[in-house]
């Protein structure tokens, strides 16, 4: 998305041979990661959620499948797995984050999540097999203050999708669903969601669907043999399936760069909340999940960050200084069950204002999942 937007902005300079754009990736394929959530409910499969990266890029972009293993910011070079070294004048770090369930004792062994394809397929098999019991949902935030977990609305979405799935299977009356939220959720305390308006709307939604909910359950450890989740607050919850939003961290190369000031070695890069430059590094920008900003680590954030960075790099080349400001804008359509959707948007100054879920909203989300996303990735929307 961003590379394509840079080509559009800098096309005259590219034609004159004054600018070249290189994209380094650790995979030849581009994955639509928000669809991993749907994999857990048998609505997406591997070939439906990926495209060859090259097919999404403008021909002017030099695309290389070569994973970055080390950043040399002082020398303005990148070292890669192949042993090559790439120089840069401007760098955009878009390495995302990775689930780290091993950071909570027992969670890797006993928990399931939907933030990677293989993990989501495993969860799908367990959800398809359960006939009775308890499905326990937990959410873990980063330890870095005021940094959200990956895709903030996803635990709510999957809870409601789970309710629909079990009803379709005819076992909902035999399976208990328990949604929990930690004591500290960015700037909020004792809540069910990290933004107050949505959190206040959730009890009514959950009660209508007979979903139990509990505030102040910060997952501390899991006993895989007894299948019990223990909270830092001293409570315990037995489960048959533990559907977790696990801890997350930056990728190894970012962790090892020494630039992050985040607590507990999480690796988030110190980001200027307006320009999206990395503090203390000349010509380096960051987009998406690796930022230390208080906004959602989700595609709806990247969609709004990309044009800001494209404008700022273009302005630095032509004018000598960045000229665009990111206002914290995020938009998405939340999946409120298997068929319903809820459009939402927010920014630094405004919280999400929940609206009634509808089938029209669900159709909009389906259209984005199945087609519009690939136009966004090409920089067309």
Predicted regions and their residues:
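Beta1-alpha1 glycine-rich phosphate/pyrophosphate-binding loop at the start
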Residues: 1-62, 146-191
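Glycine-rich phosphate-binding loop signature in dinucleotide/nucleotide-binding domains
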Residues: 15, 83-87, 234-237
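A Rossmann-like FAD-binding core segment of flavoenzymes
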Residues: 20-22, 61-71, 163-266
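FAD-binding core/adjacent interface of flavoenzyme oxidoreductases
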Residues: 61-168, 243
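FAD-site-proximal beta/loop scaffold in flavoenzymes
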Residues: 108-132, 226, 238-241, 245-304
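Rossmann-like dinucleotide-binding core of oxidoreductases
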Residues: 131-208, 212-214, 298-328
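C-terminal, flexible cofactor-proximal segment of oxidoreductases
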Residues: 310-381
């Amino acid at each position: 998305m961003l590379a394509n937007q840079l080509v559009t902005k800098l096309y005259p300079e590219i034609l004159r041979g004054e600018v070249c754009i290189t994209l380094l990736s650790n995979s030849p394929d581009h994955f639509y990661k928000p669809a991993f959530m749907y994999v857990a409910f048998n609505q997406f499969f591997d070939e439906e959620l990926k495209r060859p990266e090259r097919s999404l890029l403008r021909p002017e972009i030099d695309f290389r499948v070569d994973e970055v293993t080390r950043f040399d910011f002082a020398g303005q070079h990148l070292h890669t797995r192949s042993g090559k070294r790439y120089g840069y004048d401007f760098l955009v770090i878009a390495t995302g984050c990775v689930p780290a369930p091993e950071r909570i004792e027992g969670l890797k062994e006993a928990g399931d999540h939907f933030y990677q394809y293989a993990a989501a397929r495993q969860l799908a098999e367990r959800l398809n097999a359960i006939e009775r019991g308890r499905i326990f949902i937990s959410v873990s935030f980063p330890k870095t203050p005021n940094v959200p977990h990956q895709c903030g609305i996803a635990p709510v979405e999957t809870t409601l999708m789970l309710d629909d799935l079990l009803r379709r299977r005819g076992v909902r009356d035999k399976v208990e669903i328990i949604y929990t939220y930690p004591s500290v959720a960015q700037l909020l305390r004792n809540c069910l969601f990290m933004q107050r308006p949505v959190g206040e709307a959730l009890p009514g939604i959950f009660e209508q669907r007979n979903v139990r909910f509990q505030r102040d359950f910060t997952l501390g450890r899991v006993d895989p043999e007894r299948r019990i989740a223990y909270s830092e607050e001293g409570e315990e919850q037995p489960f048959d399936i533990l559907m977790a939003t696990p801890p997350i961290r930056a990728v190894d190369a970012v962790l090892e760069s020494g630039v992050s000031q985040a607590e507990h070695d999480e690796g988030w890069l110190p980001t200027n909340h307006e320009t999206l430059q990395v503090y203390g590094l000349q010509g380096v920008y960051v987009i998406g999940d690796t930022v230390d900003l208080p906004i959602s680590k989700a595609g709806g954030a990247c969609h709004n960050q990309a044009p800001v960075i494209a404008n700022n790099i273009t302005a630095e080349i032509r004018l000598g200084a960045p000229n665009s400001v990111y206002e914290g804008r995020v938009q998405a359509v939340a999946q409120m069950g298997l068929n319903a959707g809820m459009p939402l948007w927010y920014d630094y100054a405004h919280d999400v204002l929940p609206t009634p879920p509808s089938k029209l909203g669900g159709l909009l989300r389906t259209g984005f999942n199945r087609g519009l996303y690939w136009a966004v990735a090409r920089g067309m929307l």
